[in-house]
Amino acid sequence: MKILFAFLATLFLASPAWAVDVMMGANGNLVFEPAEVTIAAGESVHFVNNMLPPHNVVVEDHPEISHEGLAMMPGEEFDVTFAEAGDYTYWCGPHKGAGMIGTVHVE
């Protein structure tokens, strides 16, 4: 029983702190994948640069949670935490005109 508890505790502690992964530049395209996600209030979205840079995340009307610094290297990653319920539109600053836009629904 102690071994099972230790194993389960290790799995729980090793779990990521975010709710969902979003790839920036998925499959070589200027998109967020998935472009629309739903999370609970207080959870984070984990953004991963999946192609050549630069990419960032600008959250409309919420500069306090935006990650405007550019992710310059493939594999670079960061989290954005959404504390309050609502719908949040975000985009990549350099590629918004190309349609690199997404939405986070926070329940």
Label every PLM stretch briefly:
Residues M1-F5:
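Positively charged n-region of N-terminal signal peptides that target proteins for export
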Residues A6-F7, A17:
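Cleavable N-terminal signal peptides
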Residues A17-E107:
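Extracytoplasmic copper-binding redox domains, predominantly the cupredoxin/blue-copper superfamily
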